[in-house]
């Protein structure tokens, strides 16, 4: 049985189980090839400002997540997070297929769908000097056991509380893209659960007698309303 068939079968099972958790009927074929969905979102997101509701007055990260995830419903973690946010105090945060991290106090939320095709939606936000917020959205998919074969999109929005609108922040987005372009390795990210900085893990395939991959762990430091890269550890494995 090839990998494509295995993936579709596993995804069908996971979505069926999730139907029992969140009371929603899924069409598993919609979520085929999630890496293509990530690519499609990154190609189009800059054209679409998002209105933000106020369903959670004391948990802005939930409002941001609901706004973004409801806009992009062809990506399974977004669907799961949208359904979770209908009743976040009552819905399960974990089953065999989805794991939610919901931390309103620290302004952080994540929905992860583990397995061979481990993929997630992760969000947080930073306060800006002008009273706005910078909202970070990470869509990431990693093929377990396949080294550098990862797909991700790291997007940024400026939230204006006076208009309750999330506008794509292309300046910050391009700053981060320019930093990443200096590296050969494939990046994966961890948005901050606490603190302000983003962790970036680069993995580069190399051909040697003893090692196949080179890794580099750096930090995108948030200060003065922008990100700068701080170099960290490197190694081989």
Per-segment meaning from a language model:
Residues 134-169:
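Mid-length scaffold segments of soluble, non-membrane domains
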Residues 132-141, 194-200:
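Acidic/hydrophobic-patterned starts of short beta strands in beta-sheet-rich repeat architectures
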Residues 23-127:
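Terminal domain-start segments
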Residues 1-8:
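Bacterial N-terminal signal peptides that target proteins for export
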Residues 165-237:
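Short aromatic loop motif centered on NTY/YTY
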Residues 118-121, 135-138, 148-154, 183-185, ...:
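Short, surface-exposed coil-to-beta transition loops
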Residues 10-11, 21:
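Cleavable N-terminal signal peptides
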